[in-house]
């Protein structure tokens, strides 16, 4: 799926990480751990083409996506990538349904009708019947579940999740991890930046960003 080769990132003359090498395949869930400021989120952003690495390559289906132009980047994000952001990245003055319908309009391979896909996704995250509520009226945990439902509708090949349980109670955190795990077992590749031991324990491999290097803590693949 994704093969990272000798990736490096320098920010304000500081090397966040260098010579990063790892692979994540379909059906695998990987965790990136490390202290705040170590560059976990930046590494996710590079994988998602939100930032450019300072060096190295990211191979996807035979192409080095770090060399993509704007059109290819947009296509990659639309057709391949799903991102679970720390701040949810939802349209706050729109309803839950309207947020998910943005995804259905972009999906060319959506199974069934858009309305059915949205309803099924909301049911899966425990928000059935809440589609007409505005995002700004929801709690943080509920907003994270809407963002998760967006991934369920999108059905991406690659999911990048940045501290997806960081601000959640135990029940919401468990639901998020369960669904990410289900998505990986369904064939999606999942990479998670996390401090949560419960998340790490569910992953097939765990890598630590430590003193500018990537260290393998666990790999059961």
Where is each model-derived feature located?
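Conserved ABC transporter NBD signature motif
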Residues: 56-64
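Helix-to-loop junction immediately C-terminal to a conserved catalytic motif
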Residues: 48
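Conserved structural motif at the start of ABC-family nucleotide-binding domains
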Residues: 2, 17-19, 76
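Conserved ABC ATPase signature
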Residues: 134-138, 142
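Conserved signature/switch motifs of ABC ATPase nucleotide-binding domains
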Residues: 133, 153-154, 186
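Catalytic Walker B motif of ABC-type/P-loop ATPase nucleotide-binding domains
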Residues: 159-162
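ABC ATPase NBD coupling module
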Residues: 65-82, 185
């Amino acid at each position: 799926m994704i093969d990272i080769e000798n990736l490096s990132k320098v920010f304000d003359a500081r090397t966040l990480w260098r010579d990063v090498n790892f692979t994540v395949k379909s059906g695998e869930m990987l965790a990136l751990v490390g202290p705040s400021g170590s560059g976990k989120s930046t590494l996710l952003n590079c994988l998602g083409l939100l930032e450019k690495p300072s060096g190295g390559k990211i191979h996807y289906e035979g192409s080095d996506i770090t060399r993509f132009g704007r059109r290819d980047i947009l296509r990659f994000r639309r057709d391949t990538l799903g991102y679970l952001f720390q701040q949810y990245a939802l349209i706050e003055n729109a309803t839950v349904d309207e947020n998910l319908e943005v995804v259905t309009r972009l999906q060319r391979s959506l199974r069934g009708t858009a309305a059915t896909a949205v309803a099924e996704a909301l049911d899966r995250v425990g928000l059935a019947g809440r589609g007409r509520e505005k995002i700004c009226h929801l709690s943080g945990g509920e907003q994270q579940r809407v963002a998760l439902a967006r991934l369920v509708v999108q059905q991406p090949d690659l999911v990048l999740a940045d501290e997806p349980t960081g601000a959640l109670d135990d029940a919401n955190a468990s639901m998020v991890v369960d669904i990410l795990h289900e998505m990986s077992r369904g064939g999606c590749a999942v990479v998670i930046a996390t401090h949560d031991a419960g998340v790490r324990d569910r992953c097939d491999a765990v890598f630590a960003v430590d003193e500018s290097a990537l260290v393998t803590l666990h790999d059961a693949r």
